[in-house]
Each structure stands twice: as structure tokens, then as C-alpha cells.
Amino acid sequence: QNVEVEITESVFFDNQPRLLDAIRHLHQSGYRILLDDFGTGYSSMAMLKDMSFDTLKIDKSFVDNIGDERGNKIVDGIIRLAESLELSTIAEGVETREQYEYLKAHGCDVIQGYYFGRPMTAESFEMLLSSQTAGR
């Protein structure tokens, strides 16, 4: 229940029955299945119907268009679609406060990206944790 498997849409392009069966088996065994890069390439609504996903990951290419009327509508549509299918959402690549506020206000479940922090080494992460713990 604590293990998540991220699958990109391109995996479904070949529609290999053996692969699809393996994904279904993982889900039935309790693994959470996340569909990464949703809407960027090979997705189809039939795939959402036929496969058991737990989470849709909103690709950075859509997050980058937040602030544009049409971009906002697309992101909102993905969030609403996920909600209607009882899936959670993760927005990737959030870099600005505007993007964060929009996603938060429109019900995105998890928001990640450089807005919160840049990638760092394990040593830098330990130092960050130590400094935050010492300040308490």
C-alpha cells in the first residue's frame, strides 16, 4: 500500500497484453498505479476506462500554461476528470506561486516542483533537516 508504480503513457502505445496484465496484477496486489505525463502523448479515454489507476500526474507542459485562459481550462479539466473517476492528482513542475495557488484552489491533491525546492544531494538534505530541527 506504500509502493507506487509510475507508468508513462508511452507504455500503452504498444498495448502489449502481457504488460497490461502485469500492471493489472500489480494493482490487484495493492500497488498504487500512477499515470505519468497524462495527456502529453498516447493517452486515450479508453485507457482510463480499461486500466485501474490511482493517480493522474499532470505534466509540466500543462502546468506551464497556467495563467493562460485555455491552459487553465485544460488543467481544470484534468483535475475534474480525475475527481469524477475517483483518482487523485499530482501536478508536476510547479515553479511559481501563481501555478501553486491555481492548483491548490482547483483541488489538485499533490503539488510538486521547484517552487518548493530544487534537487539536492543527500548531504544538503541532511543539513536542511538539521537546520529546521534545530530551529524548533
Residue ranges, per PLM feature:
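C-terminal helical cap(s) of enzyme catalytic domains, especially alpha/beta-barrels
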Residues: 70, 104, 120-136
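Aromatic/hydrophobic pocket-lining residues that form π-stacking "cages" and hydrophobic walls in ligand
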Residues: 78
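Short, conserved glycine- and acidic-residue-centered signature motifs
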Residues: 19, 71-75
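The catalytic core of metal-dependent phosphodiesterases that act on cyclic dinucleotides
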Residues: 1-66, 81, 85-119
